[in-house]
């Protein structure tokens, strides 16, 4: 039996300069959904430019709790979270290239 896939809390940079936080168990698939307008309503109106950071969680419940906590934070705290994650995160840009931030 396969082990359950981990869940990811991710932070997107949107074209208008805003951030969008979400969770998924397949980060690449979810980012592509956001890019193609089949993701969240917010990213249909404010298309993403890149995944700024992500953090892995063992299950959906813990990822959801972390997402709620991150969404309640002001922009400055989201930036601090981003900086804390940046050392071990891959960044996915809209042109599908992968770079480290």
Curated annotation (Swiss-Prot):
Polar residues bias locations: 83-101
Domain GIY-YIG residue range list: 5-80
PROSITE patterns: GIY_YIG
Signal sequence extent: none
Recorded superkingdom: Bacteria
InterPro entries for the chain: GIY-YIG_endonuc, GIY-YIG_endonuc_sf, UPF0213_domain
Residue segments, region Disordered: 81-101
Any Pfam family: GIY-YIG
Covalent S-S links between cysteines: none
Gene3D superfamilies linked: GIY-YIG endonuclease
Family listed: Belongs to the UPF0213 family.
Protein name: UPF0213 protein XOO1228
High-level lineage: Bacteria, Pseudomonadati, Pseudomonadota, Gammaproteobacteria, Lysobacterales
